[in-house]
């Protein structure tokens, strides 16, 4: 039986060694130009453009055919999508899974709504890979990734809310006030998959301190932490050191946002996925 992990590009995972893998890109539209979120797109250049761009922008998710093509060649497919509250990717992946099972005798497709995006999705993808490499059967993998998902979390710190406002995720007035006052917004992915604001801070140091406090409050001890940044490597490294100062056994990695996450996190933004202390092991 051939296994395959399939994700959309909001996970910032474009390749995964030693397992069957496919990444299905989301797209960003700006200034009549389409940016396909692959490893080749210049995400920092896109983020720089969005800093001054005043026109209309939008995003689009993979369709059923895109997902079907990604599933091809596998008998057991494990899918992780961006939260269904932000995108239709989850529903499209589900429908594609039903069609794939009908047209491929014996095939099985499991679709997990991450209820999140970015760095938390990457934790889920990496755990799926570990479960597959451990040789666990399909139903066990599905059961264990659901259990693991109960103990992963997403935090974000944003310097700008412009693109979230353009797409109806926050009120334009809130975005304007945040920009004028130099406020950084700290938020999280809720249990329902909504991106919700926790607090607002002034200055980068205060934002990073609050993120560490939130991780502590949600049970981080010696677990894994992924920090993805949009054109803000210095802040990401600083946060890594701050996390290690409080949680010296935590396994912290720093990465970069792809195009879709750069679009929403915007220039200077940070996205942090982490495990709490009750996360099960493989």
Protein language model features and the residues they cover:
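A short helix->loop->beta-strand "cap" motif at the edges of active sites that frequently abuts
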Residues: 105-107
């Amino acid at each position: 039986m051939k296994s395959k992990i399939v994700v959309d590009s909001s996970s910032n995972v474009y390749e995964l060694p030693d397992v069957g893998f496919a990444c299905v890109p989301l797209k960003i539209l700006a200034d009549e130009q389409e940016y396909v979120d692959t490893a080749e797109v210049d995400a920092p250049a896109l983020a720089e453009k969005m800093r001054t761009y005043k026109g209309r922008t939008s995003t689009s998710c993979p369709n059923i055919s895109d997902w079907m093509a990604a599933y091809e060649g596998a008998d057991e497919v494990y899918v992780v999508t961006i939260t269904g509250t932000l995108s239709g990717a989850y529903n499209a992946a589900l429908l594609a899974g039903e069609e794939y099972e009908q047209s491929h005798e014996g095939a099985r497709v499991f679709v997990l709504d991450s209820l999140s995006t970015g760095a938390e999705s990457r934790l889920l993808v990496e755990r799926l890979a570990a479960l597959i490499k451990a040789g666990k059967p399909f139903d066990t993998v599905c059961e264990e990734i659901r259990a693991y998902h109960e103990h992963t979390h997403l935090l974000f710190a944003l310097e700008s809310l412009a693109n979230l406002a353009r797409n109806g995720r926050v009120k334009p007035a809130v975005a304007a006030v945040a920009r004028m006052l130099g406020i950084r917004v700290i938020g999280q992915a809720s249990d329902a998959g909504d991106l919700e604001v926790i607090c607002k801070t002034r200055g980068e140091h205060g934002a990073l301190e609050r993120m560490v406090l939130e991780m502590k409050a949600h049970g981080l001890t010696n677990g894994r932490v992924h920090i993805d940044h949009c054109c803000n490597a210095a802040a990401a490294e600083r946060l890594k050191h701050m996390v290690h100062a409080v949680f010296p056994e935590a396994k912290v990695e720093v990465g970069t946002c792809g195009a879709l996450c750069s679009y929403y996190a915007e220039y200077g933004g940070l996205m942090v996925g982490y495990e709490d202390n009750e996360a099960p092991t493989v």
